Amino acid sequence: MNIFSKAIIDWYKENKRELPWRESSDPYLIWISEIILQQTRVAQGYDYFLRFIKRFPDVQSLADADEDEVMKFWQGLGYYSRARNLHAAAKSMNGVFPKTYPEVLALKGVGEYTAAAICSFAYGMPYAVVDGNVYRVLSRYFGVDTPIDSTEGKKLFAALADEMLDRKQPALYNQGIMDFGAVQCTPQSPDCLFCPLAESCSALSAGRVAQLPVKQHKTKTTNRYFNYIYVRAGAYTFINKRTADDIWKNLFELPLIETSVALSEEEFLALPEFRELVAEDRKSTRLNSSHIEESRMPSSA
């Protein structure tokens, strides 16, 4: 065991977060937790995890469920493609969770990080995890300024993570470095004063903690404007099921007209798409214009 790995494991034993999925070596439970945490903070995902596994305690119960029910139990977590991928993957397992890294990696919605986490936590296999926390810790400690989102950077950090991995205790080390990045070596205001790696941290000695890790590209944002139409007929409200192949696929929503710019009420009501929608709704529900109220919400994507 190298000095870095020992410090991480020792720190983890003293500071680890008590989380329900860490009390089990069941690959199914670990898989569910990792998929939830892909786009969700631990504090938010905690209760959702407990509720989800209570209803779907194993692979077979998830595989046998209707997709609509799976989506219902995922409601509130967002990024619903994760739930659809979970359901599809469970159906492909024939009731038994795979036991090798290639098989786990082949599951729908599972990438290299998730496969490494499952295989090391559940089976004790020596696969190093590399996520945002790991990038940050390794970049700062070793003073690596190669962009983490570059091809070169991804290869470099994957090799460095593998080199630092304690092959006798891969689960402890992987959990440790992720928690270390989440709690100790945080993106903003890391606790360098009480860091067990402070004396040998390259970024700290060079005064570059705030500059590392480096990203090559900034995320490009585009403004999208979602104009939702609230159509009412007596006790009924009109909704659509999305069919577009995006993160909201198969979810229900109010009728939507998307525009590239923000529109005034007059401009919106004059849209051909709006007039067409009103005409269709009149045919199907015998509505008049007093039944239609428009509600617009801008969105960034």
Q: At which residue positions do the language-model features occur?
A:
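Basic, glycine-rich polyanion-binding accessory segments appended to enzymes
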Residues: 233, 242-286, 296
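A short glycine-/small-residue-rich loop at the edge of a beta-strand within enzyme catalytic domains
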Residues: 186, 220, 259
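NUDIX/MutT-family hydrolases
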Residues: 200, 296, 301
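N-terminal strand-loop-strand
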Residues: 210-256
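Conserved small/polar residues in nucleotide/adenosyl-binding loops
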Residues: 285-289, 301
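Catalytic cores of DNA base-excision repair glycosylases
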Residues: 2, 7, 11-193, 197-210, ...
